[in-house]
């Protein structure tokens, strides 16, 4: 039995892949450094943090980024022996404009030295990369800043060329979303004769949901699942897992389908979630009409999920107490914005201690001594 959430605490916007017998989930980190957290599992139940790819200035420098900006909704994929990571560095998110720059980096090892970033576009956020045979397709939601227009302007699709390292060809707006609005977080999948488009809708608060649409042509038009949302908590305030949405799916070697999604666990009656947005998992199946459904029925998230048909693989637990007689900080430590933490801390100045050097004020958005 798998108990949700599988990634507790601040781990929103999960993107999941399987590489042979290994499963990886990438999650957002916003203004916390290093950027993007990647967890690893072999049984979909036990997870460990194995990589934080955006760990040098060339890949990410968030000095000056406002609160809640930075890394939004990464997308992790794998093709022909290479890991691909698409990510957004948001420089501003208030008002009518959003400065959201989308990049691609690659690596042959999940915990290796990731390549120099390739800037793809800056037209929106929640980017995704879909590998379709010998073609690769880039998706993102488009942010429409024009007065009088829906800022969530639809899901854009454009081909990515591996040789030139650029987007190429026409841009297609393939899906404008449903009446829920706030259409974002696109992921594409191919099954039999259909392309399936998964999006998040309703905003990332208590109306959040996941919607499937499909088409026989990758450019659309896409028809929405006539049965409604694949997953949502919006109609049941008594659920322990609220704000369910923004997710991805993965298939096991035995053909079992699992969906990961963000959620939160609010304090009773207060609608406040001190643990932030977390990652949960649900078991799913393809119904006779070719739509993905939750195995347990309905479209609300379950706190427990039947055990996957995989050999249990627990990891050694991290120590509850850390003595600072170490050469470097463990990977579960983070700090704000800067790629140069050596400017404000030391593990050698006093043996067995983590020493912080005072920097800028608490409201500053450049360099604070906070770990």
PLM feature spans:
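Structural motif
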Residues: 33-38, 94-103, 147-157, 205-214, ...
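Blade-edge beta-strand/turn elements of extracellular beta-propeller
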Residues: 1-7, 46-65, 104-122, 159-181, ...
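Repeat-solenoid scaffold signature
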Residues: 231, 235-288
